[in-house]
Amino acid sequence: MRIAVIGAMEEEVRILRDKLEQAETETVAGCEFTKGLLAGHEVILLKSGIGKVNAAMSTTILLEKYKPEKVINTGSAGGFHHSLNVGDVVISTEVRHHDVDVTAFNYEYGQVPGMPPGFKADEALVALAEKCMQAEENIQVVKGMIATGDSFMSDPNRVAAIRDKFENLYAVEMEAAAVAQVCHQYEIPFVIIRALSDIAGKESNVSFDQFLDQAALHSTNFIVKVLEELK
């Protein structure tokens, strides 16, 4: 099976790249694509760059050029739910934009005109990730909504404003909704699996620098387990 894995930053893709066999890397429009073998699958690993425009552009190139059957978006995120700690892993059930507001024209907050309010992750991929999370003993793995915006969430006032807009939001980051929207348009199954590098609004910038590598390790190890179970 041909599986695409997307991470925004070098720190988020480096560990998985090192695990690929027969790896070959090429750069298209500034986006780095590495093809290789892992867990019996052909894996295309994309380093997309940070933010929604980079994520949307590179995911479009990925789907057009490499034709993956499924897409997994990995990397770090800021925890939003009160039950979460740095290092925990969040599996998306749904992904939304948290910085889109066209409510003046009767759209839901976060809804892009012409698009659904949120993008549902593939149920089979979520179920498979849930199965894998049952084997995790040292870290907490949960599933829930992830929201995306082109801002790092270090401002407590901004965090509070987003809490008012979305109930049961588990994590925030800067690429997933763009990846999900492109996959929705191409009808490609996707899931987002993110490990927490910080807790949004609580000295997030300091925590991010300290725990990015830990978050990358947790998310990569979890994705390897998913690939091993994927048939």
UniProtKB/Swiss-Prot annotation:
Keyword Hydrolase: yes
Domain of life: Bacteria
Pfam family, any one: PNP_UDP_1
Gene Ontology MF term list: adenosylhomocysteine nucleosidase activity; methylthioadenosine nucleosidase activity
Record GO biological process: L-methionine salvage from methylthioadenosine; L-methionine salvage from S-adenosylmethionine; nucleoside catabolic process
Cellular compartments per GO CC: cytosol
Binding site for substrate: G78, M153, M174, E175
This protein's pathway: Amino-acid biosynthesis; L-methionine biosynthesis via salvage pathway; S-methyl-5-thio-alpha-D-ribose 1-phosphate from S-methyl-5'-thioadenosine (hydrolase route): step 1/2
UniProt EC number: 3.2.2.9
Alphabetized UniProt keyword annotations: Amino-acid biosynthesis, Hydrolase, Methionine biosynthesis
Active site location: E12, D198
Family (UniProt): Belongs to the PNP/UDP phosphorylase family. MtnN subfamily.
Function field: Catalyzes the irreversible cleavage of the glycosidic bond in both 5'-methylthioadenosine (MTA) and S-adenosylhomocysteine (SAH/AdoHcy) to adenine and the corresponding thioribose, 5'-methylthioribose and S-ribosylhomocysteine, respectively. Also cleaves 5'-deoxyadenosine, a toxic by-product of radical S-adenosylmethionine (SAM) enzymes, into 5-deoxyribose and adenine.
HAMAP family per UniProt: Salvage_MtnN (MF_01684)
NCBIfam families: MTA_SAH-Nsdase, PRK05584.1
Descriptive protein name: 5'-methylthioadenosine/S-adenosylhomocysteine nucleosidase
Organism: Bacillus cereus (strain ATCC 14579 / DSM 31 / CCUG 7414 / JCM 2152 / NBRC 15305 / NCIMB 9373 / NCTC 2599 / NRRL B-3711)
